[in-house]
Amino acid sequence: MILQQPWVTWPAALSAETCDRIVARGMAEDLQSGDMSSVRSESVRASRVAWLTEPWLYELIFPYFQSANWSAQWLFHFQAIETLQFTAYGPGEHYGWHVDQTAAPYGPEHGEYRGLYRKLSLSIQLSDPADYEGGQLQLERGVPERPDRIRTITEIAPRGSVIVFPSFLPHRITPVTRGERLALVAWAAGRPFL
């Protein structure tokens, strides 16, 4: 699927106080390896994550999912927002090319998400860009032969920036070379596309 508008951004949308509150909440958790696969591979992903479920965070991000879905005319139907992921990338840490959408809907082991799969992805930039180097979000769009198919999303460099994009878009986080990049990531899940 080639999209007219493959992502929607809100540069510096959240206040420093809101970012500080999210960071404090995430750092209060015991951060675990971000490798979610059954076969650990730091060549694909090296980061640390914590899972957050505070209602105020869902209230904060839900309008961004709604606004992007309508303004970009994706018009995806979704029923749930999955557990939120606080992510930290330190020097040498990264996340290689991947898509967030699963190949099949979630099975019974995923409880309330059974029968759903990821449709929209959201990321909030929680670090000041002066606090780290590298760690850039890159998205791939369009036809593979296009020279501009890979785009570094510089619009979300300022702290408090938000991006929403379809979960089937390939994307990555380039290696952090200095400092620490912090983000809050979320996914809106819905029934399979017809």
Model-derived features: positions:
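Fe(II)/2-oxoglutarate oxygenase catalytic core
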Residues: M1-V164, F168-L194
